[in-house]
């Protein structure tokens, strides 16, 4: 197995085991962070999340679509310094529309069925991060980059 294939497998395993991520956006006054429920597509090219259009998060994304998302598997114990893994995703956000919307919505809701009413609301936007790079940190300081080709 190639290093790229191993990293992709590692990411899929992490993403399937985590429900929430920290989304970093940028406002005119500075950075802003939120917890979001996410879904990663199997090809790892997109990460999906939902938000209401009336939020600061949505406003920030409308002005500055570049984001960072952090997903990790920490347990909040001492061993995390050497055993936990964190992934920072860098990419651009777009609202999902057109023919892919129903497909992506079904995938997202399969992972987060408790968010059905929220996602079906007309006020809710389903958003996708078009991933540029994954920064994978393991064993405290081992950093690996995985660049995604569109």
Predicted feature locations:
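Charged, gly/pro-rich active-site loop segments
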Residues: 2-3, 81-150
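A short, polar/proline- and glycine-enriched secondary-structure boundary/capping micro-motif
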Residues: 58-62, 147-149
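Short helix-coil transition/hinge motifs at the ends and kinks of transmembrane helices
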Residues: 6, 76-80
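Short beta-strand segments
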Residues: 18-53, 61, 68-73, 81, ...
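Structured helix-beta-strand junction loops
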Residues: 17-18, 64, 111, 132
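Extreme N-terminal tail/first-helix region
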Residues: 1-21
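Short acidic (Asp/Glu) patches
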Residues: 51-55, 70-76, 105-115
